[in-house]
Amino acid sequence: MMLQHPGQVSASEVSASAFVPCLSPPGSLVFEDFANLTPFVKEELRLAIQSKHLCHRMSSALDSVTVSGRPLEMSVTKAEVAPEEDERKKRRRERNKIAAAKCRNKKKEKTECLQKESEKLESVNAELKAQIEELKNEKQHLIYMLNLHRPTCIVRAQNGRTPEDERNLFIQQIKEGTLQS
């Protein structure tokens, strides 16, 4: 993306605009402008920023370094920038690995916690079902005992009920008991 100038160009003539053509006035871009960029555009911007940094380094180096009264020409290669870039990438990858491991561990702990809670609730549910069965059996036994006692109960005989009424009541309660179970 560098502009080619005819003849020899001094470092002071090289500007960032030669490397990064910009259509917007400086300071007019906001963060939201960059939020929706595609990875390809982001990569282009990253390279443009790197080129701008290299341009500033080159201009300062060319201004300060001269050999036999003329500027020393420096070629900026990928190898000069690569160690810094590689180190940054390595640090970022390392941080990403740590964050990913932390996320996996949290997810694993959450899954284990939910599994334990599920097992606990299932055992409580089984205990409650067993208790329900015990209570149903106890209810049936009490109804049976009550019905055995009814024909001989003095209190009921005084109320004017006959043993026939008691037998019908007993049959009715048995039917109700089987319908409810």
UniProtKB/Swiss-Prot annotation:
The modification Phosphothreonine is found at T162. This is Cyclic AMP-dependent transcription factor ATF-3. SMART domains: BRLZ (SM00338). One of its GO terms (molecular function) is DNA-binding transcription factor activity, RNA polymerase II-specific. There is a cross-link at K78, K175 (Glycyl lysine isopeptide (Lys-Gly) (interchain with G-Cter in SUMO2)). Residues 88-110 are annotated as: Basic motif. The gene is ATF3. PANTHER family: CYCLIC AMP-DEPENDENT TRANSCRIPTION FACTOR ATF-3, FOS TRANSCRIPTION FACTOR-RELATED. Residues 114-142 are annotated as: Leucine-zipper. One of its GO terms (biological process) is regulation of transcription by RNA polymerase II. It is found in: Nucleus. It comes from Bos taurus (Bovine). Signal peptide: none annotated.
